[in-house]
Amino acid sequence: MKAGILGVGRYIPEKVLTNHDLEKMVETSDEWIRTRTGIEERRIAADDVFSSHMAVAAAKNALEQAEVAAEDLDMILVATVTPDQSFPTVSCMIQEQLGAKKACAMDISAACAGFMYGVVTGKQFIESGTYKHVLVVGVEKLSSITDWEDRNTAVLFGDGAGAAVVGPVSDDRGILSFELGADGTGGQHLYLNEKRHTIMNGREVFKFAVRQMGESCVNVIEKAGLSKEDVDFLIPHQANIRIMEAARERLELPVEKMSKTVHKYGNTSAASIPISLVEELEAGKIKDGDVVVMVGFGGGLTWGAIAIRWGR
């Protein structure tokens, strides 16, 4: 049995925070932010909207597209570093709200690589014959762990959710290969401090991301028995346009073959890849039979990538 993605969905908060808005909050400029990150604006969830609310909205869209009923879900995996609370988990909260009574549920904490960890975990359960339908959600309310007085990090992050239903597909479609990894020795470069603010050593994270994203892209292509010429589209974690471009150049892809949503939404951590996937499908940039590479990196340090032949 082969596992693939049956349907996707997303939730984007209404409130827009532009670079010009940030100019009034910290010592920065629109030009500085755009030049270094590619970000022009980001979305911020309302005070009374939490990760579970965004996750449910994205999940409902994904289930509808997949034509899978919530009661037919066997497992719910939520990738997040911003749960509503320590426990119960976001996955259990959305299990109740969706009415997915038979699904087991757990959260995954792998920061910006979390969605990749979730998809690969779901794949393993499906291809082993244990489960048939797994809901994977990447959701973050990063505005709740951002120091809005720190000019280095306040400009980066946004809120949102993306979801995918992973299930059985035909043998010539689905996930072709994957890579997951971690390097705990780099944990001090990106972490949450005692004030619940995100602390980042930008230089070290940048070096790690450029190297690892490129390597992971090449690795999953080789594991799938493919070459760079076989790749139709790249969806990198939307952290920084310079990091994204480095991954694209490693695959020798033209600009139009890489997803770019960072300018609209900023870095939404675990939500960025599924949000981008929805956008590119809606734009008609990914077609049945296309080979798509998705790759992310995050705090931990963690990374993950998959190569998938799109379709059912």
Curated annotation (Swiss-Prot):
Pathway: Lipid metabolism; fatty acid biosynthesis
Keyword Repeat in record: no
Catalysed transformations (reactions): (2S)-2-methylbutanoyl-CoA + malonyl-[ACP] + H(+) = (4S)-4-methyl-3-oxohexanoyl-[ACP] + CO2 + CoA; 2-methylpropanoyl-CoA + malonyl-[ACP] + H(+) = 4-methyl-3-oxopentanoyl-[ACP] + CO2 + CoA; 3-methylbutanoyl-CoA + malonyl-[ACP] + H(+) = 5-methyl-3-oxohexanoyl-[ACP] + CO2 + CoA; malonyl-[ACP] + acetyl-CoA + H(+) = 3-oxobutanoyl-[ACP] + CO2 + CoA
Database matches in Pfam families: ACP_syn_III (PF08545), ACP_syn_III_C (PF08541)
Subcellular location: Cytoplasm
Signal peptide: none
Major subcellular site: cytoplasm
Keyword Calcium tagged: no
Domain commentary: The last Arg residue of the ACP-binding site is essential for the weak association between ACP/AcpP and FabH.
Cited function: Catalyzes the condensation reaction of fatty acid synthesis by the addition to an acyl acceptor of two carbons from malonyl-ACP. Catalyzes the first condensation reaction which initiates fatty acid synthesis and may therefore play a role in governing the total rate of fatty acid production. Possesses both acetoacetyl-ACP synthase and acetyl transacylase activities. Has some substrate specificity for branched chain acyl-CoA, determining the biosynthesis of branched-chain of fatty acids instead of straight-chain.
PANTHER family tied to this protein: 3-OXOACYL-[ACYL-CARRIER-PROTEIN] SYNTHASE, BETA-KETOACYL-[ACYL-CARRIER-PROTEIN] SYNTHASE III, CHLOROPLASTIC
Family in the record: Belongs to the thiolase-like superfamily. FabH family.
Record NCBIfam families: fabH, PRK09352.1
Matches recorded under HAMAP family: FabH (MF_01815)
Protein name: Beta-ketoacyl-[acyl-carrier-protein] synthase III 1
Organism: Bacillus subtilis (strain 168)
